[in-house]
Amino acid sequence: MEKRELVNIIDYTLLHPTANKADIESFLQEVVNYGFKTIFVQPYFVPFAVNWLADHDVNVGVPVGFSLGGATTHVKVEETKEAIRNGAKEIDMLVNLGALKSGDYQMVETDIAKVVEAANGLNTKVIIETALLNQEEKISVTECIIRAGADFVKTATGFNGGGATVEDVRLLNEIGKGKIQVKAAGGIKTYEDALAIIDAGATRIGSSGAIQIIRGETSTSSY
């Protein structure tokens, strides 16, 4: 895959907590200049991004339950509905890590299913923070995600330690057995990293350093 083709599978992201409106506007100009198909911004900036990109074929995505996943299901559902009203076209939700670590997989699955229902057919990806999980947890939560009807399992936010590895992407792809796609995010810093992750089975990549990757440079971003 050529570097420029990566714009079709990279979700270009600006979720830094100190990003302001001017930063978002510069980011959106880069999105248009490079031809990215999907982007992610914080919920506050979704209306601005949707309006700014009105004449361009770009999906604006939003994180839900970001970045720790501990919000109640009701809060995640309402966050999803508001984001959609504001024009969001993709949802990346964080799994309830506390419930997962407590072994309450029924709650984990219900939490995801309710957000999937609220998304009403839009692409829904579930972030599991692979660096914080053991292998049994990775398997169990991915099975929950499949049963809940989400479209993707996503490796990480990049904010909570660790990120995508070839081994984790390969494992999630094997667990998914074609029933769910894998989005890799966190720690993908070079074009070579991206190719290795794709070869392992990822069909989508999340990165705030996408332009550096496409240029053949090394991204300095952790997410």
Swiss-Prot record:
Pathway: Carbohydrate degradation; 2-deoxy-D-ribose 1-phosphate degradation; D-glyceraldehyde 3-phosphate and acetaldehyde from 2-deoxy-alpha-D-ribose 1-phosphate: step 2/2. The keyword Cytoplasm applies. It catalyses: 2-deoxy-D-ribose 5-phosphate = D-glyceraldehyde 3-phosphate + acetaldehyde. Its main location: cytoplasm. InterPro entries: Aldolase_TIM, DeoC, DeoC/FbaB/LacD_aldolase, DeoC_typeI. One of its GO terms (molecular function) is deoxyribose-phosphate aldolase activity. One of its GO terms (cellular component) is cytoplasm. The keyword Hydrolase does not apply. It holds the Pfam family DeoC. It comes from the Bacteria. Signal peptide: none annotated. Its EC number is 4.1.2.4. It is found in: Cytoplasm. CDD domains: DeoC. The active site is at D92, K154, K183. Keywords: Cytoplasm, Lyase, Schiff base. One of its GO terms (biological process) is carbohydrate catabolic process. Catalyzes a reversible aldol reaction between acetaldehyde and D-glyceraldehyde 3-phosphate to generate 2-deoxy-D-ribose 5-phosphate. Belongs to the DeoC/FbaB aldolase family. DeoC type 1 subfamily. This is Deoxyribose-phosphate aldolase 2. The lineage of its organism: Bacteria, Bacillati, Bacillota, Bacilli, Bacillales. The gene is deoC2.
